[in-house]
Regions:
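Membrane interfacial helix motifs at helix-loop boundaries and amphipathic/re-entrant anchors
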Residues: 28, 32-49, 91-103, 154-167, ...
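Hydrophobic alpha-helical segments of secondary membrane carriers
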Residues: 138-142, 269, 393-397
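Conserved aromatic/hydrophobic "specificity hotspots" at molecular recognition or selectivity sites
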Residues: 159, 163-202, 246-249, 259, ...
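C-terminal membrane-cytosol helix-exit motif in multi-pass small-molecule transporters
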Residues: 172-188, 206-215, 234-247, 474-482
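Hydrophobic transmembrane architecture of multi-pass small-molecule transporters
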Residues: 176, 376-377, 381, 393-483, ...
Length: 505
C-alpha cells in the first residue's frame, strides 16, 4: 500500500519507550514506598498523597491533553510531556521532604497526561488499519512487560541504591525517547478548530473529583464525609460537561461516538475488565510476600508466567484479528481472564505457587488476546482527525475502571480480612496482615501468624470472585453489543464515520 511511513516500526519503538517510562515509574514506586517513608519520615497521609497525587492529575487532564494533541500536534504535545516528566523525575531525586516529592509527582502527572493519549493517537495515524493490530499488540506487550518487570526493577534498585534511583531511571529513557521522536517521528494533527475552554475545565474538575471520590471510598465509604462532596462535584461537573459538549458548536470531545455500538460497548467492557483487574497486583503481591513469604524481587518474578503468556496472546491475536475479526478474540480472551480469577479464588494459605502460576498464565493469555482487540474495536470507530481525544477517552475509561477496581477490591479485602480474624485480636492485627505478622513475630506467636494468613486468603478468595464476576460481565456485554469487524473491512454502522467527523469538527 502506497503512503505507508517507512519509519513506522521505528516510530513504534519510540511510542513504546514513551509508554514504558510511565508504566515502570508507577509500578516501581510502590516497591520504594517503605524506604521512602522511612527516609523522609513521612506520615501515612504523606505516603497516600505521594501515590495519589499523580493519578489525580493524570486522570483529570487526559481528555484536555488529547484535545491539545489534535489541535497543536501530537508529537509536539508528547515531547512537551516527556520533557516535563523527565524534569520532574530529576527533581524528585533531590527531594528532602514529602512535600517536595508530592510536588514532583504532580508535575509528573501533568507530563504523563500529555504523553499517554499522544502515543496511541500517533500509532493510529502512522499505521494503516491492516497493520494496526500488530502495532497495538506490540505496544500492549511492552506495557505488560513494564507492569510485570517494574516491581523486580524497583526491588533491585532499592537493594543496591536508594529510593531516589526509582525516579532517576526515568531520565535516560526520557532523553532517548525525545531524541528518537525528534529524528524519526512526523508531526500529525487534526483540522484546526476553536478551543473549548469550558469543556476542558469541566472535564478536568469532573474527572479529578471522580477519581478522588473513588480513592476516598475505603476511608469514608461511598457517601460519607468528604466522599459525598467529591461525588457531588463529579456529578455536577461531568453532567455539565456532557450537556455543554452536546450544545457547543465545536466540542472538545465528540460524544456522538458513543452512538457507535463498538465504541460504547467497548468502552463499558474495558471499564468492567479494569474494575476486575484493578486490585490484582495489590492482592497477589501481598499473598506472595506475606503468605508465601517471598522477597519483593521474587514476588515480582512470580508474574513472569503472566508476561510470557501475554506476549503469546498478543502475537497470536494480532494475526487472528485479520482472519476472524475483533469480537471472537474479545470473547475468548475475557472468558480466559474470568476463568483465571475463578482459579485464583480457590487459593488458600497452603496452596503454594503452582495454582497461582497457572492462573496468571491464563490471565496473561486472555489479556493478550482480548485487550488489544477491544481497544482496536473501540479506536476503529474514531475518525483520524480526532485520534488524540479518542485515545484520551480510552485512557480515561481504563484509568477510572482501574481506580474503581482498586477501591472496591481493596475495601473487600480489608473488611473480609478483619471479619475473619479471631475474636480478641488486637486492632493492628485486625487492620492488616502486615500488622498481624509483625505482632506475631514480636510475641513469637505462630498461631496468630497462621490465623492471619488464613484470614487473608479467605478474604482474597471473595475479592477475586468479585473480579471474576466483573470480567465475566464484560465478556457478556461484549457478546451482546460488539459487532464483529476485521481490520480494514467496511462496516455498516448506525452513524457513518463521515457524519461523526462532521459533527465532531
Amino acid at each position: 500500500m502506497e503512503g505507508r511511513n517507512p519509519r513506522r516500526w521505528w516510530i513504534l519503538i519510540v511510542l513504546c519507550l514513551s509508554t514504558l517510562v510511565l508504566v515502570v515509574d508507577s509500578m516501581a514506586l510502590t516497591v520504594a514506598v517503605p524506604s521512602m517513608t522511612e527516609d523522609l519520615k513521612a506520615t501515612a497521609q504523606d505516603t497516600q498523597w505521594i501515590l495519589d497525587s499523580y493519578i489525580l492529575v493524570f486522570a483529570g487532564l487526559l481528555l484536555t491533553s488529547g484535545s491539545l494533541g489534535d489541535r497543536f500536534g501530537r508529537r509536539k504535545i508528547m515531547i512537551i510531556g516527556l520533557l516535563l516528566f523527565g524534569a520532574a523525575s530529576l527533581a524528585a531525586t533531590v527531594c528532602t521532604n514529602p512535600g517536595e516529592v508530592i510536588a514532583s509527582r504532580v508535575a509528573m502527572g501533568v507530563g504523563g497526561a500529555l504523553i499517554m493519549p499522544s502515543t496511541l493517537s500517533i500509532l493510529i495515524t502512522v499505521f494503516e488499519e491492516d497493520e494496526r493490530g500488530k502495532a497495538m499488540a506490540a505496544w500492549g506487550s511492552v506495557s505488560m512487560l513494564g507492569l510485570v518487570g517494574s516491581p523486580v526493577l524497583g526491588g533491585v534498585l532499592i537493594d543496591h541504591f536508594s529510593w531516589h534511583s526509582i525516579f532517576f531511571i526515568n531520565v535516560p529513557v526520557v532523553v532517548l525517547a525525545i531524541t528518537a521522536a525528534l529524528v524519526l517521528m512526523p508531526e500529525s494533527r487534526g483540522p484546526w478548530q476553536k478551543a473549548d475552554p469550558l469543556g476542558a475545565v469541566l472535564s478536568a474538575v469532573g474527572m479529578t473529583a471522580l477519581i478522588w471520590w473513588i480513592i476516598e471510598i475505603p476511608k469514608h465509604g461511598a457517601f460519607g464525609g468528604t466522599s459525598l462532596v467529591s461525588l457531588a462535584v463529579a456529578v455536577v461537573a461531568l453532567g455539565g460537561f456532557v450537556v455543554w459538549e452536546n450544545v457547543v458548536a465545536e466540542p472538545m470531545v465528540p460524544l456522538v461516538l458513543f452512538k457507535q455500538r463498538n465504541f460504547s460497548g467497548g468502552s463499558l467492557s474495558l471499564t468492567l475488565v479494569q474494575i476486575g483487574n484493578g486490585g490484582l497486583l495489590l492482592v497477589l503481591t501481598q499473598y506472595l510476600q506475606f503468605v508465601l513469604d517471598y522477597s519483593p524481587v521474587k514476588a515480582g518474578l512470580a508474574f513472569v508466567p503472566m508476561a510470557v503468556a501475554a506476549l503469546i496472546g498478543n502475537g497470536a491475536g494480532a494475526g487472528l484479528t485479520a482472519k476472524i475479526g475483533f469480537r471472537p478474540l474479545v470473547l475468548v480472551g475475557m472468558g480466559l481472564m474470568a476463568g483465571s480469577f475463578v482459579l485464583l479464588s480457590t487459593v488458600d494459605a497452603d496452596t503454594g505457587f503452582t495454582v497461582p502460576a497457572v492462573a496468571l498464565a491464563l490471565l496473561g493469555l486472555g489479556a493478550g488476546l482480548a485487550m488489544p482487540a477491544a481497544v482496536g474495536a473501540l479506536m476503529g470507530e474514531i475518525p483520524p482527525e480526532k485520534a488524540g481525544v479518542g485515545s484520551a477517552l480510552n485512557d480515561t475509561i481504563q484509568q477510572a475502571g482501574t481506580a474503581l477496581g482498586i477501591a472496591i477490591l481493596g475495601s473487600l479485602l480489608a473488611s473480609g480480612y478483619a471479619d475473619k480474624m479471631p475474636a480478641g485480636s488486637s486492632e493492628p492485627a485486625r487492620q492488616s496482615i502486615v500488622g498481624a505478622l509483625a505482632e506475631a513475630g514480636a510475641k513469637d506467636d505462630a498461631g496468630l501468624a497462621h490465623a492471619a494468613r488464613e484470614a487473608f486468603t479467605s478474604a482474597m478468595s471473595t475479592t477475586l470472585t468479585v473480579s471474576a464476576a466483573g470480567v465475566l460481565a464484560a465478556a457478556l456485554l461484549a457478546a451482546v453489543v460488539l459487532r464483529n469487524r476485521k481490520p480494514g473491512a467496511a462496516e455498516a454502522p448506525e452513524a457513518p464515520k463521515e457524519d461523526i467527523a462532521e459533527l465532531a469538527v
